[in-house]
């Protein structure tokens, strides 16, 4: 039971909204975390910090004169790196980084999202389970961390571990099972 506020207390609290805080960003973080099934809030904050650093770097590069060779070289390096990572869908201009480099763009490169896109799992939650249980490898490396970011080049090498029960079931379903591999 709370007492009724006095007049001067009401006046002081008139402009304070207890439901919406500035630091919550309108609950954008929980929405992104739920969409991409991010388990640690720190991962979201790391991605947010990375996006801010990239935007800040792009802004500082844009302040240099357009004919500066240093600016041209580093703009191209930054754009190539972001395209190779898969954060950018096309090789674009440095001015597009403000809108295109987002936390969602980085989250789309997470291993569970790539597995869902490649139809290796029905949902992102299932993909997270498969990764944590040790069923997935990228290239020759077994991956147990769902926060693993897959580059554009490594996307083709996402596959099941050789002795995985899921791989065995898939091969049996397709009638491609080789008894020598699973003996």
From Swiss-Prot:
Compartments, record wording: Nucleus, Nucleolus
Gene3D superfamilies linked: RNA-binding S4 domain
Database matches in CDD domains: S4
Assigned keywords, A-Z: Nucleus, Ribonucleoprotein, Ribosome biogenesis, RNA-binding, rRNA processing, rRNA-binding
GO CC annotation terms, alphabetical: 90S preribosome; Mpp10 complex; nucleolus; nucleoplasm; small-subunit processome
Function (record text): Required for the early cleavages at sites A0, A1 and A2 during 18S ribosomal pre-RNA processing.
Assembly and oligomerization: Component of a heterotrimeric complex containing IMP3, IMP4 and MPP10. Interacts with MPP10. Component of the ribosomal small subunit (SSU) processome composed of at least 40 protein subunits and snoRNA U3.
Entry protein name: U3 small nucleolar ribonucleoprotein protein IMP3
Originating organism: Saccharomyces cerevisiae (strain ATCC 204508 / S288c)
